[in-house]
């Protein structure tokens, strides 16, 4: 099968925003204008196409990023047909892992901001992630029809809060109830969309008299930004020559791809205005797969760096970036193909696990429908059915040319909840459900507590785990009771000590003998967490038993002596010991090492560590005192305060996770729902003595 759409006409884009900026409505309009959906789905009535999981519809927030394929030839059909793969990314802080994962497979992004609320704390998190993956982006200021809408204020906020370099290429005509369209600064004409056909057609008009001066000013700003792309253009501009529309677009594109500027547009998705011009900007200014650098990876056989060009001729390579369970076909694995071609029925290599996988069927998704396809080519995104053992973030590639694309790193979960099935019948189903969900979401973990036998689930926040429990119920029919959230404490040591243990048993026949002397010392926090150094001289412990000493200590790390939490940030030096020709064994040295470690830990002034969260609260000024007082009561340390640019304050603080449970409810009631907050894990630090005592008591109780 030949390629239908040239790779240069592909656009893999993410629509990214904080909650309530109107991202789902924006995505919905994109799908409408690109000819996919005929009835416009509104989030307000729970019918949006990309929010295809039931709970997303209930909560009105987008949780799983669906990859949707659609086509666009321009508002005035001025372009050849382009193929868009739109990846909808979640905007809630508990889902930042999902956002990171989407960023990894995007080529470009559209950041959606609310014309009233502007740049929110969550927007900053997403911006940082886009910087990390060097994603070129446009900004779309939505909700221009709302009371208090102000496009130019958002331009300023992008500069001050995101340290961005926004370059408006349109400006609004009117605002709030009078918002009627935009001025296109390239053509210097107004664009008014036809309300009768929901904005499918439009007319160019003259710029309203009161806007001519403002439009001139912003056009100059845009041309200056374009001229900086090259010396030639700068000379032409400074020489007083007009730059052509083509030159301006080409220069803006060049600088957008380099991450130097972020073109800005505006509109109201709800009122069907502005999204169409933004789609044209995606074609004009965001990258095709061939515009971004070749994807980097590592050859698993040689561990040497390797890369793949975005070309059908290259060997096949793809990244699995999302798992979904589908009622009808089972597991769907979304893959981004970076190079080569893969056909249904092909056998490929999972280079991370070193296993072979057969691609059963391939489907391309529109938000809730799917089309079977025979093959996927470089630069495209599709879902594979029938993969047996592939997890998010793993690479699929041709067996003849193995490569591991970037290993994605996921943060450690910070919150645990015990779950128990309501009935015996639910027990087995719950195990299957949790394992499937863990496969979809690497930031979610499942384990069994050895002492209590309870199933413990861990995740990135309360909402994250609430949604997991909710999905178990809906998708797998498992009813479960959940315990109170628990904090992922850790233990460590505060001083260096020397410890020794001799394990000697004689009980008729072969005895057991292992003797180790270790030195323990605290390590820099946040590093590897554990380091083992063999300093045995003169063979006092034979070589073959050294790994057993390491293993004995490693096996003891998960259960510390303060309150049974995992031990971190310790360095162990094995300095001396002895052995017995007959009675020494690997097991004897494991046991000796384990006991020596426990003994050493008791002497090394052990401490309990608790997770500290970076918390940002945006609040109207009149609630400032209450918010600060509440954070102090929660043992928070306020690091600073800024104006949020819209008459309120932004408070930055570090607060122990243990004190943050139920915070969203408390904050809502204290500020009549007007304050918002975001939090992410920052670091572990030592818990105060009274907290450590209470935690220890609770564990032993």
UniProtKB/Swiss-Prot annotation:
Residues 8-290 form the tr-type G domain. The keyword rRNA-binding does not apply. GTP binds at residues 17-24, 88-92, 142-145. One of its GO terms (biological process) is ribosome disassembly. Keywords: Cytoplasm, Elongation factor, GTP-binding, Nucleotide-binding, Protein biosynthesis. It is found in: Cytoplasm. One of its GO terms (cellular component) is cytoplasm. It comes from the Bacteria. It holds the Pfam family EFG_III. One of its GO terms (molecular function) is GTPase activity. InterPro entries: EFG_II, EFG_III, EFG_III/V, EFG_IV, EFG_V, EFG_V-like, EFTu-like_2, G_TR_CS. The keyword Transmembrane does not apply. Transmembrane segments: none annotated. Catalyzes the GTP-dependent ribosomal translocation step during translation elongation. During this step, the ribosome changes from the pre-translocational (PRE) to the post-translocational (POST) state as the newly formed A-site-bound peptidyl-tRNA and P-site-bound deacylated tRNA move to the P and E sites, respectively. Catalyzes the coordinated movement of the two tRNA molecules, the mRNA and conformational changes in the ribosome. Belongs to the TRAFAC class translation factor GTPase superfamily. Classic translation factor GTPase family. EF-G/EF-2 subfamily. This is Elongation factor G.
